[in-house]
Amino acid sequence: MADVLNALEEKVVELQQSESVEVIKRHFREFRKIWETARVELEYSSIQLDSVLRYEKAVQEYIRLNRRYRNKIASGEPWLPIAQEIGKIVDEEEITSPSDGSLQKRSMDNSGSWQSDDIYLTSASQVTAAMRDIHAQMVQAVDMSAENAMELSSSTNLLETLQEKYFGVEDVLYTSKRIIKSLKLSDRSDYFLVVSGFGFFIFVVVYLLFKRIVWPILSMFLWFLR
């Protein structure tokens, strides 16, 4: 950026020293090319305040010279370099009013106007720097909102996946409950079946014992009693 600012300032000096219309037109074209490069670097790179002030001062001087050139062309006056025009004005003032007091007053007025121009340029540069900071903050806020939107979308997808898994687990739990209930019923029926089978087995055993062992002994005992 420093090289571009130096080129802008050198081009402003060349514009001020231009002695013909063709030369100043060429310098205007070259200045505009350098100006485009400076605008790009100023937009996409971090620039210090003094560099912004130099940039604004060079651009304002270019605008002033361009306006002066257009006024000269519109009025039909010949183009003169800044130094020659100032010397011409001083010579005319010395002829018309050679007093030192008036010259000092006029020089003070000129210096005051330059100081006011510097104040305006400083204010404009500060506003430009503030706008650049606001632009950077807005870009950062947009990036943060985009990141938050991406995180929110990712969280939404995760919640949807968890919801689907929850519904799947709920279906599995419902099916498992039905299976457990049917297994309990099966266990109860099996228990009754086993108990009834065991009871029948005991009955058969008791019947056989009574029929084969107890009854013959009992019948013999009853026969002797008769």
Curated annotation (Swiss-Prot):
Sections of the chain in a coiled coil: 53-75
Disulfide connectivity? none
Q: What are the entry keywords?
A: Coiled coil, Endoplasmic reticulum, ER-Golgi transport, Membrane, Phosphoprotein, Protein transport, Transmembrane, Transmembrane helix, Transport
Residue ranges, Cytoplasmic compartment? 1-189
Q: Which residues lie on this side of the membrane: Lumenal?
A: 211-226
Its membrane topology = Single-pass type IV membrane protein
Chain segments annotated as transmembrane: 190-210
Matching PANTHER family, A to Z? Answer: BNIP1-RELATED (PTHR12825), VESICLE TRANSPORT PROTEIN SEC20 (PTHR12825:SF0)
Family statement: Belongs to the SEC20 family.
- The protein's name is Protein transport protein sec20
The beginning of the lineage is:
Eukaryota, Fungi, Dikarya, Ascomycota, Taphrinomycotina
